[in-house]
Amino acid sequence: MVPQGWSLAWVSVLYVSVIPSLHIINNENSVFIGTHSETELRHWLIFVKMAQRSGTAWWRMASVPINAYFERDIAFLFNPRCVIETALGSKILCRYNKNIGVVFVDNDTTCNVSFPSGVQLQLLNQSVMESIRTKTYVVDYARKTTERGDCFISVAFCRKERRRFLPRYERFVYYCISVYLFAVAVFCSCWFALDPLFNMWA
């Protein structure tokens, strides 16, 4: 007779080991997720560091129009910590930490950046920009450094390639695998949970 707690442990091991691996595969193939409008050039591209393995950093990207209500649209990522003022006078509140970088996309290379004391930016380094250039965006960018020299805003002219998400058939395969594993887990869990009852009737 199988102990009743065994099935729960088996299901837990399955989900901890197998299901996250599917998400990791999915992240590696669709690490840059976002949109860029052909008619609306003023966007914030937010790069969120997802994972790092073998010295390679993977970043997830979201895109928000600059005239959108910033805190409402991406409140789950940011708390206001600094103010970025564009050349047209728009002020955007944003937050920086070691896992988040911000690229200002505009056809105007002038902007003013101000920070409260103690706030330090995580710079988007050359390798990240090269990754953007080769994998997702065709980017020509310029750097604007503040007078204090502690940060820069990358001003980019971007053309979004059509490779945004996993191909439909790959997403279907991952979906089928997930459903199959879930069904197996439920079946085995029910089987081992009812095993003592079957033995009692026997």
UniProtKB/Swiss-Prot annotation:
Name the record gives this protein: Protein U22
This protein's UniProt keywords: Host membrane, Membrane, Transmembrane, Transmembrane helix
Membrane topology: Multi-pass membrane protein
Claim: Transmembrane is one of the keywords in the record: yes
GO CC annotation terms, alphabetical: host cell membrane; membrane
Locations listed in the record: Host membrane
TM helices/strands, residue ranges: 5-25, 172-192
Source organism (scientific name): Human herpesvirus 6B (strain Z29) (HHV-6 variant B)
Main location: host cell
